[in-house]
Structure formats: C-alpha cells, structure tokens
Regions:
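Nucleotide-sugar donor-binding/catalytic module of glycosyltransferases
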Residues: 1-163
Length: 163
C-alpha cells in the first residue's frame, strides 16, 4: 500500500499535462501512487496518461467516455485510492520535486493527521506569485478549528479544493 495517493483529474490537458506528470516522476519521495482520471478528453490527454502509466507501475489510469466534471473525477480517484494519505493535483499544475517528501517528513515528525502547503502561481510574464492562506506551522485540533477554518472555508460555503 502506498503512503500517498495523488489524484489528478484530467480533461483536455494535452498542452500542459507533461509538466504535471514530470513533477510526479521527479519526486524525491517515492512511496506514492498516481491516479489519473481522464474525464472524457478528446485531445491527446488520454494517450499521454497511458504512456506515462506504461513507464511507471505506480500510475493507474481510469478513462471515462464522456466528461462528468472535476468533482466526479476526484470522487472516482478517491474510490480507487490505496494510499494512507490522499492529495489532489490538477493537470495544469505541478509539485516542486521535494513537495511530497517535505510534507511526509513534517507529518511524520509531528505525528499530525494531515499536512498542507501554500502554492506559487506562475504568471504569463514568467514571474512567480507565492500564495498561502495558511500560516506555516504545526497545529493541534483546537488551533485548526480556530485559525484554519476561516482560511480553508473562507466566507463561502463552498471553496475550491485548489485554485
């Protein structure tokens, strides 16, 4: 059983999927599985998923004949996940190469039940914009309820998993 399941919903992602997959292949932490859910893509995304899976036994691909949306794709991934922990990655995003290792080690050292991190936007002009709704730190249940519920949920009842 892998330590971490990474679920990637894929739809019409041919132009940028290679960067996402490369970021997984180059992770310094190796005890992961990658679940690619091709959600009815009509571009070359499905073939890229299959090619990547053929090279790495940790990768599983699920193809849907028609698009059902990102939530259903993630739910399919959740149903298939075998990891002790689960994370999501969008097909047009990528991880830093040490991301999973860093999160895993911090979680192991602290005994935490979950780990989270910020993100960096790569802007069209090549600049980067770091974003984080969560201050760095290790939190107990009470602190999570007090400090993190607002940033995680925001002022809305529904907040994107990642945006």
């Amino acid at each position: 059983m892998p330590s971490i399941s990474v679920i990637v919903p894929v739809y019409q992602a041919e132009k940028f999927l290679h960067r996402c997959l490369d970021s997984m292949a180059r992770q310094t932490f190796s005890d992961w599985e990658l679940i690619l859910v091709d959600d009815g893509s009509t571009d070359g995304s499905a073939a890229l998923c299959d090619q990547f899976a053929a090279k790495d036994g940790r990768v599983r691909v699920f193809h849907r004949k028609k698009n059902h949306g990102v939530s259903e794709a993630r739910n399919l991934g959740l149903n298939e996940a075998k990891g002790d922990f689960i994370t999501f990655l969008d097909a047009d995003d990528c991880y830093e190469f040490q991301a999973l290792e860093t999160l895993w080690n911090l979680r192991e050292q602290s005994g935490a039940d979950a780990a989270a991190c910020g993100l960096t936007y790569l802007l069209p002009d090549g600049k980067q914009s770091a974003q984080s709704q969560l201050p760095a730190g290790i939190y107990g249940e009470k602190e999570i309820r007090e400090k993190l519920t607002g940033p995680l949920v925001g002022d809305r009842l529904t907040q994107p998993v990642f945006n």
